[in-house]
């Protein structure tokens, strides 16, 4: 197993590899200064399939490279906070403005009922298991904690 954490200035992006050719992406921010994008990076490494995209919160800097990730790779599943509906994200973001990455994520979530999970999840990666938890919208005022 290998975890690469990338410099995306503000935000987050990490790629988890099982050592057998399967990867998952934890957040998909990009680096505006260098032009680094997660999907282009993976494609340049010869990786075209992403087992899962794990979105840790609904801030733009955590998903600013999502469109590139979807354009350059086949993302099999998105794991996100399922307690937060796409409509609620749009409502919360109406106060501060919704960036293109969040808009893409919300649109993808609206088109698929099969994304996300709570509890133990199997991404089909050798030797890697993870458990998903989420915060409830009623417990927080901002999307950074959702």
Each model region followed by its residue ranges:
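Active-site metal-binding motif and surrounding structural segment of the metallo-beta-lactamase
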Residues: 19-24, 33-83
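Metal-dependent catalytic neighborhoods of phosphoester/phosphodiester hydrolases
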Residues: 63-72, 88-98
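Core dinuclear metal-dependent hydrolase active-site scaffold
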Residues: 1-49, 109-146
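Conserved glycine-bearing catalytic or ligand-binding loops at nucleotide- and phosphate-handling centers
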Residues: 89-123
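Surface-exposed, flexible loop/turn segments at secondary-structure boundaries
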Residues: 61, 86, 138
């Amino acid at each position: 197993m290998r975890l690469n954490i990338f410099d995306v200035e503000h935000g987050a992006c990490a790629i988890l590899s099982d050592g057998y050719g399967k990867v998952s992406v934890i957040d998909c921010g990009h680096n505006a200064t260098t032009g680094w994008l997660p999907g282009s990076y993976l494609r340049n490494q010869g990786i075209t399939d992403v087992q899962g995209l794990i979105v840790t919160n609904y801030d733009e800097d955590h998903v600013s490279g999502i469109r590139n990730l979807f354009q350059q790779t086949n993302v099999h599943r998105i794991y996100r906070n399922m307690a937060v509906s796409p409509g609620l994200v749009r409502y919360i973001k109406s106060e501060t403005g919704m960036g293109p990455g969040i808009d893409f994520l919300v649109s993808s979530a609206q088109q698929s009922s099969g994304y996300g999970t709570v509890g133990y999840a199997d991404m089909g990666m050798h030797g890697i298991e993870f458990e998903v938890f989420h915060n409830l919208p009623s417990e927080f005022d901002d999307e950074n904690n959702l």
